[in-house]
Amino acid sequence: MPPVNPPPNRLDAVKPMFSARAALLMLVAAIGGALAAAIVLPLWAPTLSESLLGPEPKAYWYLARSAGLAGYLLLWFSVAFGLLISNRLARAWPGGPAAVDLHQFASLVGIAYGLFHALILLGDRYLSYTLWQLVIPFGSADYRRVEVALGQIGFYLMAAVTLSFYVRQRIGYRAWRLLHYASFAVYSLVLAHGILAGTDASALPVQVMYIGTGAIVLFLTFYRILTAMNRPRPAARETA
């Protein structure tokens, strides 16, 4: 049986917005920046570090919190645009190709912020995280172990889903699409991590942000389900 060509609107024909090299450089820059600020600067330039961060620096904690919130918003942005693409609402705004590019961009930059969010905590003296506690889920027993692990697992799933775009041709469109369903788990885990482990979750603006973004994702998800259920099925081929 000859191979069937995919429809022209299938995402398997879309190329990544960034090359693999550019994506790798972005992630390496996030890792290097966090490690330089948390480890190298205090060791090699303690005077400069103290002048920037103070004698008892809480700047690392503030940087981790702000990077975490930014990473969450980028994840939400990516998930929302992914749902807009699958619902075909993106045709109205901002257009299919632009929506795909924004979806990829937000995902990749979100990973970079997630890396910075975790690794910058190496400089925090209050929690005194080790590298292994930051990279291994349930590795920390001092601060909300389960709640922190939700974010760690969500990050790894997010990285797998995002970077799968670069191996889409190897794993096949069907496997790539199935892997993308993990985005719902990613968003749920990261949202739970932010609400349960984040010290800013008690602030009213942050609560409004979580409720608003969560409601939008929920609406787009139900809209996708309803449109898929009501979509006419292709007629079965007649057999001789």
How does the language model describe each region?
Residues M1-A240:
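Membrane-embedded alpha-helical bundles that constitute the cytochrome b-like, heme-associated redox core
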